[in-house]
Amino acid sequence: MKRVAKRSFKPVFACLLLPRYDSAGVKIMLKIQLSIRIERPYVGLVSRVWLRQAVKLTLVHTGMSSPVELGLVIAGDDTVHELNRSYRNVDSTTDVIAFALSERGANAEPFITPPDDVIHLGEVIISYPQAKRQAEERCHPLERELALLVAHGVLHLLGYDHELPEQAEKMRAMESRVLDTMKG
C-alpha cells in the first residue's frame, strides 16, 4: 500500500465569532473553531481569508447556531487520490473529500453535544490541482471554485448529500447561495 506523502504544512487555527440572529431577532454569536492547513506547494496561492469566509457563509446559510469545530486542508492530487482510494475505494483523485465525525442528516441518531458544547464536524480536504483544473474547465476564477468546494465539503459534514436528484438540487441551491454572497 502506498503511503500518503508526509505533509509539509502547519495548521493555522482561527476562532471566529460571527453575529447571527435567532427567530425572535435576538443577536447570537456563532463560534467557529477552524483549522486551515495548506500543503507547502500551495501556500501563498490560496487566501486563508477567502477560505474562512466560505466556511462562515456556508454555516450561516444552513442556519447553524451551535459552536462548531472543523478542519480544512488544501492538498495535492497525490494526497487526495490516496484518501479517495483508502476510504472510498475509488482509484483516482477527486476535488473534495469530507470526513464527518458523526452521522448527520434526516435518518441519523440525535447528535449528543460534547461537554464543551462545541460540535466537532470533521475535516474537508480539497485538491488544489483539481480545483484549478475545474476552474479552467468552467471558465471561472479559481477562488470561486475553491469557495464552491469548501461549501460542498462543509455541507457534507452537516449531513447534506447528492445521491438522489432532490438531495442534489437542495445541495446545489445551498452552494449557489454561498457563492452569491461571497465578497472578494
Stretches with model-predicted labels:
Residues 2-147, 155-184:
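An acidic/histidine-cluster motif and surrounding catalytic segment
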